[in-house]
């Protein structure tokens, strides 16, 4: 047998290594299915082929439903043909005015052009710009109706009726074709204001020459212009002062007087409190009866207490007597038994 000792280098100093006595094995390693992984070369793992076949069912592109959002329909309001023609005329007239320029004398040039151009200007103010975005059909129809009514009013105005002016003679009416010495300039149109064109048309047209359009007839009585005579009287009359106001009616007869209540008369001073309430006065006979009843009640209560005491005493004495008798009997029995 051979002895295999462990070398000294593996153990620390001053410590003896343990000696293992084992016999060496003469058997050689044999490759087998178990230890082939330990001693042999590693071979790649091969997966067996799939014998069964299966088909993958994928949805076709035609059957797939792709959710999409419908685009919003944009409706644009088209201008009427009459309004576009009027707008073109106004642009050409504006270019001609820019070419001529202001007068050399420094004064404003008078409006010598016919009043049709002024009518076209007003009609260009009345016609709105093309609308963009989502527009309801109801609002489109209403605006088209108002535009047609305004164009009708301008055409009625340009046929030869008079024009009201603040500086014109004969009732404030100028004949057709003559310029106004100081023409009244209408204010600029306010956006999002549907009543402004109707107000301007009512100021330009007279009361007798109002057109039969539904847009202008809807305006109230305050919007309609007054007669020239009424306008003269209103201008000539000075403004009333703030003091001239209708006074109220005065009540006829003397004013009603309220009855004054007399002050409370106190029988005691303010610092002192009220006197104590008095008890009701009783007759002497009633007092005597009350005292007698009180005495009887007291006597009854005293008698009850005495009776309770007596009963308690008698019961105690009876109990004591019974106890004494029992003791005597016991003593007598003991003595008699001891003697026997």
Curated annotation (Swiss-Prot):
Segments of skewed composition (Basic and acidic residues): 75-90
Cleaved signal peptide residues: none
Database matches in Pfam families: POM121
InterPro entries: POM121-like_prot_1 (IPR043220)
Stretches with biased composition (Basic residues): 242-251
Biased composition (Low complexity): 228-241, 254-266
Stretches for region Disordered: 75-130, 215-281
Taxonomy, superkingdom: Eukaryota
Biased amino acid composition, Polar residues: 91-126
Similarity section: Belongs to the UPF0607 family.
PANTHER family, A to Z: POM121-LIKE, UPF0607 PROTEIN ENSP00000332738-RELATED
Protein name: Putative UPF0607 protein ENSP00000332738
Species of origin: Homo sapiens (Human)
